[in-house]
Amino acid sequence: MTTLTASPVAARENRVLADRLGGTIVREIALVAAGTIAMIVLARISIPLPFTPVPVSLGTLGALSVGTTLGARRGLASVATYVILGIAGAPVFTGTNVGWAFPSFGYILGYLLVAAIAGLAAQRGADRRIVTMAPTAVVSLFSVYILGLAWMIPFAHMTIEQGLMKGFVPFIIGDLVKAAVATGVFPVLRSIFR
């Protein structure tokens, strides 16, 4: 009688960067806390735009990085902690936004999608090669618009066209640049930390 089990070598090949550190509950908490801190720092780096309620922010790159580095479960926990802190009133969101009652809050919820997609893809090895990291980065980063626009359009009483022109079109080039950065960085990190 044979049993099917994953060999340690096969399991190691599909790990994310954070798994290289060994495993304890303290380590798990520390990784989630580090991911949350990364989100806070990167999301606070923003440029307000006068024609839209949505600022240019490194929050999406933060969510992509946290998901890719920590994996889906830890990445989601990190981003969820960041979101909960902001809803509770901690000054972690861009500008002076706290709570949930502002037009760009949907984009913050979208960070959860970004981290989940990037984390799941990284767990399957997508961050190892440029050819797989590029579509992972693009799909992950652009997923933020699903919740972002779904929240902003009704909240700000916009038409779909207005929402796209204020909450999507101005950010396409910036998100493609962020995707290019991630595509260049993560395969290199993976090759260094084998």
PLM regions and their residue ranges:
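Juxtamembrane/interfacial segments around transmembrane helices
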Residues: 79-91, 110-121, 157-162, 184-194
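Hydrophobic transmembrane alpha-helices
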Residues: 2-76
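Membrane-embedded alpha-helical hairpins and interfacial helices in multi-pass inner-membrane proteins
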Residues: 52, 125-194
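Hydrophobic alpha-helical transmembrane segments
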Residues: 29-33, 61-65, 75-81, 104-109, ...
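Generic alpha-helical transmembrane segments of integral inner-membrane proteins
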Residues: 33, 37, 41, 65, ...
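Interfacial aromatic-anchored transmembrane helix boundaries in multi-pass membrane proteins
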Residues: 44-55, 83-114
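Short helix-perturbing small/polar motifs within transmembrane alpha-helices
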Residues: 3-21, 27, 41, 98-149, ...
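Juxtamembrane membrane-interface segments at transmembrane alpha-helix termini
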Residues: 66-69, 89-96, 177
